């Protein structure tokens, strides 16, 4: 009996030791576990679990890492990142970089992404790295971007009407970068996505949040974010160049290439077609451009601008209180992303000078250029001879966010960067007793048309100039067309169906 008891005792001891070994091999869950909607800070990161309904579990681990599981949900988001006070733009924060790794196992509709919001404007944004059964957002892409070592993303913009937001129920824009192929680990330059969006006209506001996020929609799944490092402020936007190099007044000067400013709010922003400009301008702000070479003289000024309010820009020489050369009056263009070129006459200026733009209120500026001839007819001499060459850049108004005045190699200027639907208006053209044809000097790579209309872009159609390819945008040819007999003083509008550069045009009394 004693022998049997000893055997049982030895067996029990072995079992206990085995259990201890097994327990010792199981990792202890050190993270905090939450099940329902909650926000807070953990491990130096801001976190949030949000759902409308369903079963959710989120375990908060060291630093930015976490794991999550979901089922029977409507919509659920699990995220860890950094929140801000909506008082700085991404440029003011500096470079934002996310380095991540995730064991991602969705069953149905889900995203693995960098996610966040901005205010003013209110924007919800996604940089989607991987997804489940459906690739978001189900819209037509605006373009693509490629990041070195990160791959290619398609860009989308969608609108949410009366939907939940960080400011309650609201209507707001959603911006999307969606990879063309899935991945679950890597490094994301968030700032580069923001820059590319703005260059496509997708304006960012003041930063509220950036977070690595797992989102599920009417699905189930689990994910283990084993790496999530968010670095902010490594490389703020550099100050503009202080280069003393002379700049040609008659070539386009990019607004963001200024030498100094008195503004604490001004920022370099993105503009359509991958451009840049300046914005967040306030009354009294000044921007200085050094060493502008006017040669024998300039008497005109044009700027490509966007604004939702009427405002004005003074053009001064050498200092913010220097000689007032002229004032550019800017009417609302309809939105901060709708750019138009506006022109004004200035007092003749020669030689090399610093130019200071003095602002009376908010406006976005893409670029500006000076001209040797006055772009606006002088008071008391407000008609133009239809039978003398009319420079294309001497328009009174234009429609088209990307239209630009540029210098020609042999001297003079022209208009270009024209797209379908753009138009330019030339006021007070004196046709006398009647013109029946028009000739334009143009350059284009592809066949296109220019409609000649009376009064407005939808006014009476006088005729259409059919333009064949000239071989390149630098090869100019004269092209003519017959128009309906036009007499007296009229406003003429050129309406474009596609890309073309226009140097000048002129009317004649006989058909061509």
Curated annotation (Swiss-Prot):
Pathway: Glycan degradation; xylan degradation
Residues binding Ca(2+) 1: 254, 256, 276, 366
Entry's EC annotation: 3.2.1.8
Annotated positions binding D-xylotriose 1: 271, 280, 337, 364
Class of enzymatic activity (EC top level): hydrolase
Pfam families found in the cross-reference section: CBM_6, Glyco_hydro_11
Residue ranges, annotated region (2 X 61 AA approximate repeats): 279-477
Gene Ontology terms, MF aspect: carbohydrate binding; endo-1,4-beta-xylanase activity; metal ion binding
Record note on temperature dependence: Optimum temperature is 70 degrees Celsius. Thermostable.
Binding-site list for D-xylobiose: 280, 337, 364
Swiss-Prot/TrEMBL catalytic activity: Endohydrolysis of (1->4)-beta-D-xylosidic linkages in xylans
GH11 domain span: 33-228
Protein name: Endo-1,4-beta-xylanase A
Lineage: Bacteria, Bacillati, Bacillota, Clostridia, Eubacteriales
Gene for this chain: xynA
């Amino acid at each position: 009996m004693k022998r049997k008891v000893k055997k049982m005792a030895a067996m029990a001891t072995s079992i206990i030791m085995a259990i201890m070994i097994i327990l010792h091999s199981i990792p202890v869950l050190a993270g905090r576990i939450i099940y329902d909607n909650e926000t807070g800070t953990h491990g130096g990161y801001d976190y949030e679990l949000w759902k409308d309904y369903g079963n959710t579990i989120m375990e908060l681990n060291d630093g930015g890492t976490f794991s999550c599981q979901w089922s029977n949900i409507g919509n659920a988001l699990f995220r860890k990142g950094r929140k801000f006070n909506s008082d700085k733009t991404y440029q003011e924060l500096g470079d934002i970089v996310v380095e991540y790794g995730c064991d991602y196992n969705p069953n149905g509709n889900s995203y693995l992404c960098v996610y966040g919001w901005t205010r003013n404007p209110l924007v919800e944004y996604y940089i989607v790295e991987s997804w489940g059964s459906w690739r978001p957002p189900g819209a037509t892409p605006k373009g693509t971007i490629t990041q070195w070592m990160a791959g290619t993303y398609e860009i989308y913009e969608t609108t949410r009407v009366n939907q939940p937001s960080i400011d309650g129920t609201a209507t707001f824009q959603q911006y999307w970068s969606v990879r063309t192929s899935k991945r679950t680990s890597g490094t994301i330059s968030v700032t580069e996505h923001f820059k590319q969006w703005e260059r496509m006209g997708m304006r960012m506001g003041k930063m509220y949040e950036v977070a690595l996020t797992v989102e599920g929609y009417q699905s189930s799944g689990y994910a283990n974010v084993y790496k999530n490092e968010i670095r902010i402020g490594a490389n703020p936007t550099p100050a503009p160049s202080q280069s003393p190099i002379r700049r040609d007044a008659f070539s386009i000067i990019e607004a963001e290439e200024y030498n100094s400013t008195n503004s604490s709010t001004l920022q370099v922003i993105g503009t359509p077609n991958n451009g840049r400009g300046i914005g967040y301008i306030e009354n009294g702000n000044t921007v200085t451009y050094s060493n502008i070479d006017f040669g024998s003289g300039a008497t005109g000024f044009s700027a490509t601008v966007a604004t939702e309010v009427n405002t004005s820009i003074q053009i001064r020489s050498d200092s913010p209180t220097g000689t007032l050369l002229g004032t550019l009056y800017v009417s609302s263009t309809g939105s901060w992303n709708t750019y138009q070129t506006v022109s004004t006459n200035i007092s003749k200026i020669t030689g090399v000078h610093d130019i200071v733009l003095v602002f009376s209120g908010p406006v976005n500026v893409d670029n500006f250029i000076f001209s040797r001839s006055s772009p606006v007819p002088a008071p008391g001499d407000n008609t133009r001879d239809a039978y003398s060459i009319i420079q294309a850049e001497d328009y009174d108004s234009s429609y088209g966010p990307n239209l630009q005045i540029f210098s020609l190699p042999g001297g003079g200027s022209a208009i270009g960067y024209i797209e379908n639907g753009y138009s330019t208006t030339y006021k007070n053209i004196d046709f006398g007793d009647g013109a029946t044809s028009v000739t334009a000097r143009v350059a284009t790579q592809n066949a296109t048309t220019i409609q000649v209309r009376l009064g407005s872009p939808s006014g009476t159609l006088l005729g259409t100039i059919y333009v064949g390819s000239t071989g390149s945008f630098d090869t100019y040819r004269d092209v003519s067309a017959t128009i309906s007999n036009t007499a007296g003083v009229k406003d003429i509008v050129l309406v474009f169906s596609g890309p073309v550069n226009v140097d000048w045009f002129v009317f004649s009394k006989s058909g061509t």
